[in-house]
């Protein structure tokens, strides 16, 4: 092998260098400056001649668009010149081929350069210190600049010379027998420590007896490792299934039995519950897009199907604590595969996410309630890093895979208990929560049982030494105290591009309907291959023989133990008939997804791993296992997965000392409010929503953001099941961990109350159809905690029974504690309730943003308070004053909640509610303030009525004679609704007749940031401030976090925009229906939706084209490269959005290379560009492609030619998702020309969307020739470069271009994701929409393209 190195000192922006400089200065104040340089390491076969063509291709791929001169060099530009400078280089570990390398190699191999084996990048840093300062050792800065798990320091001695394999460690011992027969239990104890198996005394006794007495032989290290994973708490849930003895009394039911029994009191609409990777319920009949072929290019069609609705949720806490970004990416990926792994295959639609971390200690933003002396485990990331990087990881994975994140929660908590200062409550071990919605064909609900002769196949990425022992590591009762290397080995790394390919394979199989070759499917998670392959053959204890040489290895040094136990990601295992092998291989080849047929079902009840290839003949494979042959794993399934004895847990209740909340005398309301608003749980979550795609897939009817300025306030999330249906899935979340510190039982009831209070504002089928996932994160095996969790679970099941709803799934994480020094810190016991329910019509909903003032209507506010109480225990107010309180809110009147839910649903269906929001974190005052923020509206609230009617006030405010504080900040179950004054009496009467307490709060008045929020108690004024002042206080913590994760200039610009923003003004067509009129054609108009690997937006594009009467064909780049399709066959060529090759080497670079550098494809595209009867459309990634191949702008399409137009990184230096306002100027486009002067909202979701041009003359030329087709505009419709109105910094707001003849159109925004009105997150009251209008004005552009094709035929 040979490695060539290329250096680029221009690869990093000034903003990136500034960000690194800030981090280094926090570590060492003597740092003056930092320069960065990228090094590309290209490894290729020594037998292959290094061609000039390969060199030129590499230069073209890595060269920055529009860069002047040649920045790439064979020699490094940065050199250390003295003792005050430090030069260090950080790159990937040699034995870990990164996803970046995988994508690079794919690009080269698709272009015929099969000799390229690997391509990695390292970063060189030249750090300069102040005069007189001596540079420290490089090791000091490595943790700040690199990822310990995947990267290492490169030095002269530690740099790959000719191959990344040359410095691999010597092959580790493959596996061996453990001498249990000779040494007894002591041998198990020793291997338990060496391998980090997390065996407790019970396990050690059990496995000693199994091997020494039952089997009479020594176990192998692979077998013991397998048992540790397969039978860990993480996998087996021993605690939830165990016998509970509390204070000497055995409880009649286990935790899991109590939970499962909730199903007896609800509608029986579950189709899957407690028995698969996800849960499911009866869904809807609808039409969906199905391809005519999944192995070749062809037309897609609409097909009627019945879909079940899927939900799943899990956490990924320990990996996220150790490595936040990687832990969150793989947590997201694992949950996605849980959706894929339901029945015979499921399809993900959208995700939810949640984060619970310790005290943040944001630099320069000190909070009085955050203790300053807290320490953290050396192997854990600090809370601030966890919150930023974990949310980055989950967002990045979803963005690249193509799953929007549309709901969630965030909490930062770390306090010394007010009642006992020695008790520290903090999320030292954090929570990373991931939930997901999806659908599954109703005919695919049941996995088929394994039968002799069937094949076991692995679909997805190759085997890596990652996630080794994660199931056991996650089951250790107290983390942070063990071997650091074992902690890091247990963490995985994610590859969203591979997950996308894997998902396409599963979906393709489902598209075959009854011919689906997948008989059963499971996702690979804890326990790796050993667990997932056994799961496939567990039914009936069928058994299988597995051949280790059939697995694709990503690391040549993988041992048998690692192959069997590593939890490497992006991998599913399937069961199929032998005669379906060829079909599956064809599907995977077309989708470029690896597949390995690794085993065969034997029917003998054993699972055997053989270290050899599989025989070609099926009968030989069935009989391949020779019992005299030594193998690393050979056990009967009954010993590993059979019913094992229940474990008994002897628990004791411990009384928690509680102390009454003590608020300062003379407390000012605005001071208390400002503190409360600064809490992560209460304030804006914009730092989360800005960076995550919330619209990809085109099925989103409600995501987090609402109102004119898209404030992240939504109470629920909502998706449709298809682009051709208004039926959908609603979901909401309830979690109240701080109340659980005081009263776990009350906390459980309040979790359900919050979840339903969030769900109430979308019209669902009925309450008894609601099902819940219950996720428990608790240090349950530590003293007192198990009993507390039991009490919470018992109360949870009671309230679910009372409400006639049920749990149908969930997960537990019972090792929520960490060792800090000699102290064990328990994370607050946390329950997350996620509801999901059928929604017959997603258009029947309301959001929190006030509507009246913006519409010029007079409206009033009603408070639905179910308990007639105002208690402050466990509240945001208590946390803001570094306390917990004593008397916590509770829901004792569940019957009233049921009635209130039913009444509100009825009023919603009758159109009598304008807006609604639940009272939760922060209490009533925050609730109404958020409604005002969402609607850019003022309000005038009078507390006279609630103060007169409420019965139970928190004792802390009684002492101060300040009952209004309890009314305003108590987090009792309830919600606030906005109603028209003309409907007020009817609405109040409806609630009162049902016995639901409701209090009149006041009126809305004033529109815009200058409006005022006025709060009174009779004639006594409590608060009177401009909305803009309170809005900025609500946004402040999010702003501080934004500065740490994006370009600080952009963060500041957005924060300061709250001084001048107003509701955006739209201008629609005079007659939408007339504009949507389609011409008649005697022949079909055929268009190709062309997708490269990593594209994720083709289905929403297909839906728009199908509505426009096109004959839509699904065509992959593989089809073009193999010659099974040609672009000459189509009248339209469509390039959808996504992340082709995960944006490796730059957005659309790899995609463009496959066109420009392929001698067969380039002439096809050049000919298509010249034809006068065809058109093309590229959106987002497709837009980036069109600039590179010369379809728009004045770029040439010759090989290697630099474009004159390029899409560069957003000014914010990160991915941006926004509902932006855009204007269509006068333009030549055949699609947008008729829409000139329209001003509309449109989804934007990209990381590299900033248009750049060769020079100013080109911009002037494009504008004068009317080739600019779309511009970002401000709130009054003028083109803007101001962030965030312009989300990427494009000059003059340019967001789209067309060719000089108007036939080729490239847009960065996503009109295909808002072509239906239900997809719009905000519609101004002045924007007239017919009640029967389902299509939005954006559909016009697709219809225009069809009409142009028909006209050009005539």
UniProtKB/Swiss-Prot annotation:
The active site is at 1180 (nucleophile), 1310, 1312. In the N-terminal section; belongs to the FGAMS family. Pathway: Purine metabolism; IMP biosynthesis via de novo pathway; 5-amino-1-(5-phospho-D-ribosyl)imidazole from N(2)-formyl-N(1)-(5-phospho-D-ribosyl)glycinamide: step 1/2. GO terms for molecular function: ATP binding; metal ion binding; phosphoribosylformylglycinamidine synthase activity. It is an enzyme of class 6 (ligase). It comes from Drosophila melanogaster. CDD domains: GATase1_FGAR_AT (cd01740), PurL_repeat1 (cd02203), PurL_repeat2 (cd02204). It comes from the Eukaryota. This is Phosphoribosylformylglycinamidine synthase. It catalyses: N(2)-formyl-N(1)-(5-phospho-beta-D-ribosyl)glycinamide + L-glutamine + ATP + H2O = 2-formamido-N(1)-(5-O-phospho-beta-D-ribosyl)acetamidine + L-glutamate + ADP + phosphate + H(+). Keywords: ATP-binding, Glutamine amidotransferase, Ligase, Magnesium, Metal-binding, Nucleotide-binding, Purine biosynthesis. Gene3D superfamilies: 3.40.50.880, Phosphoribosylformylglycinamidine synthase, linker domain, PurM-like C-terminal domain, PurM-like, N-terminal domain. InterPro entries: Class_I_gatase-like, FGAR-AT_N, FGAR-AT_PurM_N-like, PurL_large, PurL_linker, PurM-like_C_dom, PurM-like_C_sf, PurM-like_N. Residues 1087-1337 form the Glutamine amidotransferase type-1 domain. Its EC number is 6.3.5.3. GO terms for biological process: 'de novo' IMP biosynthetic process; purine nucleobase biosynthetic process; purine nucleotide biosynthetic process. GO terms for cellular component: cytoplasm. Disruption phenotype: Pupal lethal. RNAi-mediated knockdown in the fat body reduces energy storage of both triglyceride and free glucose, increases waking activity during the day and the night, reduces sleep bout length, with total sleep bout number reduced during the day and increased during the night. It holds the Pfam family FGAR-AT_linker. ATP binds at residues 327-338, 407-409, 714, 920. Mg(2+) binds at residues 715, 754, 758, 918. Phosphoribosylformylglycinamidine synthase involved in the purines biosynthetic pathway. Catalyzes the ATP-dependent conversion of formylglycinamide ribonucleotide (FGAR) and glutamine to yield formylglycinamidine ribonucleotide (FGAM) and glutamate. Because of its role in metabolisms, is involved in sleep regulation.
């Amino acid at each position: 092998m040979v490695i060539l190195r290329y250096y680029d000192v221009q690869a990093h922006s000034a903003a990136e260098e500034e960000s690194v400089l800030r981090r280094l200065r926090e570590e060492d104040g003597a740092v003056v400056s930092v320069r960065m340089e990228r090094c590309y390491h290209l490894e290729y076969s020594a037998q292959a001649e290094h061609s000039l063509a390969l060199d030129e291709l590499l230069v073209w791929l890595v060269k920055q668009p529009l860069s002047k001169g040649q920045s790439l060099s064979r020699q490094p530009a940065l050199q250390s010149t003295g003792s005050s400078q430090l030069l260090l280089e950080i790159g990937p570990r040699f034995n870990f081929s990164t996803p970046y390398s995988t994508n690079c190699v794919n690009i080269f191999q698709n272009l015929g350069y099969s000799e390229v084996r690997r391509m990695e990048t390292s970063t060189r840093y030249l750090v300069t210190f102040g005069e007189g300062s001596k540079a420290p050792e490089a090791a000091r800065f490595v943790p700040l600049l690199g990822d310990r798990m995947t990267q290492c320091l490169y030095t002269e001695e530690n740099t790959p010379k000719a191959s990344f394999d040359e410095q691999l460690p010597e092959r580790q011992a493959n596996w061996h027998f453990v001498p249990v027969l000779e040494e007894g239990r002591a041998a198990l104890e020793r291997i338990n420590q060496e391998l980090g198996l997390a065996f407790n005394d019970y396990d050690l006794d059990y496995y000693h007896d199994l091997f020494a007495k039952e089997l009479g032989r020594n176990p192998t290290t692979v077998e013991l490792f397998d048992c540790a994973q397969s039978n860990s708490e993480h996998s087996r849930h021993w605690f939830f299934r165990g016998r509970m003895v509390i204070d000497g009394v055995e409880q009649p039911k286990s935790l899991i039995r109590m939970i499962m029994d909730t199903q007896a009191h609800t509608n029986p609409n579950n189709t899957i519950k407690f028995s698969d990777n996800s849960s499911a319920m009866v869904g809807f009949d609808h039409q969906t897009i199905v391809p005519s072929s999944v192995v070749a290019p062809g037309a897609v069609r609409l097909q009627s199907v019945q879909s079940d609705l899927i939900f799943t949720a899990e956490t990924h806490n320990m990996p996220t604590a150790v490595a936040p970004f990687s832990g969150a990416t793989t947590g997201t990926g694992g949950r996605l595969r849980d959706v894929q792994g339901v029945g015979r295959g499921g399809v993900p639609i959208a995700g939810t996410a949640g984060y619970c971390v310790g005290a943040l200690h944001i630099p320069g933003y000190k909070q009085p309630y955050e203790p300053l002396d807290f320490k953290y485990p050396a192997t854990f990331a600090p809370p601030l890093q966890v919150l930023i990087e974990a949310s980055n990881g989950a967002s990045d994975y979803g963005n690249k895979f193509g799953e929007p994140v549309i709901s969630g929660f965030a909490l930062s908590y770390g306090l010394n208990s007010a009642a006992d200062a020695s008790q520290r409550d903090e999320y030292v071990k954090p929570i990373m929560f991931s939930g997901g919605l999806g659908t599954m064909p109703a005919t695919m609900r049941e996995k088929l049982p394994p039968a002799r002769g069937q094949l076991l196949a692995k679909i997805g990425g190759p085997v890596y030494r990652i996630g080794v022992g994660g199931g056991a590591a996650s089951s250790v009762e107290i983390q942070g105290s063990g071997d650091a290397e074992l902690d890091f080995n247990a963490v995985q790394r994610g590859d969203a591009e591979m997950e996308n390919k894997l998902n396409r394979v599963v979906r393709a199989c489902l598209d075959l309907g009854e011919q689906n070759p997948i008989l059963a499917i499971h996702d690979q998670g804890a326990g790796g291959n050993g667990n997932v392959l056994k799961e496939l053959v567990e039914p009936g204890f069928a058994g299988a023989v597995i051949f280790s040489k059939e697995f694709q290895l990503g690391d040549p040094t993988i041992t048998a133990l690692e192959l069997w136990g590593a939890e490497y990601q992006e991998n599913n295992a399937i069961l199929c008939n032998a005669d379906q092998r060829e079909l599956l291989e064809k599907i995977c080849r077309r989708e470029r997804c690896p597949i390995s047929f690794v085993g065969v079902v034997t029917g003998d009840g054993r699972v055997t791993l053989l270290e050899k290839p599989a025989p070609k003949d099926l009968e030989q494979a069935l009989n391949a296992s020779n019992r005299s042959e030594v193998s690393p794993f050979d056990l009967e399934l009954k010993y590993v997965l059979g019913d094992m004895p229940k474990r008994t847990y002897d628990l004791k209740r411990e009384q928690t000392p509680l102390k009454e909340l003590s608020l300062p005398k003379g407390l000012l309301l605005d001071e208390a409010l400002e503190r409360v608003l600064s809490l992560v749980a209460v304030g804006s979550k914009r730092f989360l929503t800005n960076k995550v795609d919330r619209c990809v897939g085109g099925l989103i009817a409600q995501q987090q953001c609402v109102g004119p300025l898209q404030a992240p306030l939504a109470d629920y999330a909502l998706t449709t099941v298809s682009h051709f249906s208004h039926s959908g899935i609603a979901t909401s979340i309830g979690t109240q961990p701080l109340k659980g510190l005081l009263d776990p039982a009350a906390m459980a009831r309040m979790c359900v109350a919050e979840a339903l209070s969030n769900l109430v504002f979308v019209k669902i089928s009925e309450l008894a159809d609601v099902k819940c996932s219950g996720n428990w994160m608790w240090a349950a095996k530590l003293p007192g905690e198990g009993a507390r969790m039991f009490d919470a679970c018992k109360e949870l099941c009671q309230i679910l029974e009372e409400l006639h709803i049920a749990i149908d799934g969930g997960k537990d994480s019972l090792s929520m504690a960490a060792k800090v020094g000699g102290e064990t810190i328990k994370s607050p016991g946390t329950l997350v309730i996620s509801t999901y329910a059928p929604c017959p019509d997603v258009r029947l909903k309301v959001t929190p943003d006030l509507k009246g003032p913006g519409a010029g209507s007079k409206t009033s506010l009603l408070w639905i308070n179910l308990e007639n109480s105002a208690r402050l225990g466990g509240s945001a107010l208590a946390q803001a004053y570094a306390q917990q309180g004593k008397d916590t809110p509770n829901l004792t009147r569940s019957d009233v909640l049921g009635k209130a839910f039913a009444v509100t649903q009825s009023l919603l269906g009758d159109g009598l509610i304008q807006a609604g929001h639940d009272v939760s974190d922060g209490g009533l005052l925050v609730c109404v303030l958020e409604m005002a923020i969402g609607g850019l509206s003022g309000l005038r609230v009078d507390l006279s009525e609630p103060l007169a009617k409420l019965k139970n006030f928190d004792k802390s405010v009684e002492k101060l004679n300040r009952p209004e504080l309890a009314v305003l900040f108590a987090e009792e179950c309830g919600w606030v609704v906005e109603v028209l004054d003309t409907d007020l009496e009817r609405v109040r009467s409806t609630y009162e007749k049902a016995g639901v307490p409701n209090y009149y709060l006041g009126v809305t008045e004033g529109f815009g940031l200058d409006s005022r929020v006025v709060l009174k108690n009779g004639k006594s004024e409590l608060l009177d401030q401009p909305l803009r002042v309170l809005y900025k206080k609500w946004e402040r913590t999010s702003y501080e976090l934004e500065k740490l994760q994006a370009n600080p200039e952009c963060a500041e610009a957005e924060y300061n925009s709250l001084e001048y923003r107003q509701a955006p003004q739209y201008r629609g067509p005079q007659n939408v229906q007339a504009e949507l009129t389609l011409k008649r054609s005697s022949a079909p108009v055929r268009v190709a939706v062309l997708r490269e690997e990593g594209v994720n937006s083709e289905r929403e594009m297909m839906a728009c084209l199908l509505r426009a009467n096109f004959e839509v064909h699904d065509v992959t780049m593989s089809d073009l490269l193999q010659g099974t399709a040609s672009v000459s066959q189509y009248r339209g060529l469509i390039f959808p959005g996504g992340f082709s090759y995960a944006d490796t080497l730059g957005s659309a670079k790899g995609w463009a290379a496959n066109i420009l550098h392929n001698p067969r494809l380039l002439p096809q595209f050049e000919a298509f560009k010249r034809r006068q009867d065809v058109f093309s459309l590229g959106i987002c990634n497709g837009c980036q492609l069109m600039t590179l191949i010369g379809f728009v702008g004045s770029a040439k399409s010759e090989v290697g030619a630099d474009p004159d137009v390029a899409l560069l990184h957003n000014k914010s230096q990160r991915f941006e998702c926004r509902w932006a306002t855009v204007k269509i100027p006068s333009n030549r486009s055949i699609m947008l020309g008729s829409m000139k002067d329209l001003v509309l909202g449109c989804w934007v979701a990209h990381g590299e969307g900033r248009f750049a041009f060769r020079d100013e003359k080109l911009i002037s030329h494009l504008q004068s020739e009317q080739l600019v087709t779309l511009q970002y505009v401000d709130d009054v419709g003028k083109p803007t470069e101001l962030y965030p109105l312009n989300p990427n910094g494009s000059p003059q707001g340019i967001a789209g271009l067309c060719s000089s003849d108007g036939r080729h159109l490239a847009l960065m925004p996503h009109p295909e994701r808002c072509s239906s009105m239900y997809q719009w997150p905000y519609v101004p009251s002045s924007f007239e929409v017919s009640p029967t209008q389902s299509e939005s004005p954006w559909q016009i552009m697709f219809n225009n393209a069809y009409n142009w094709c028909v006209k050009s035929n005539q």
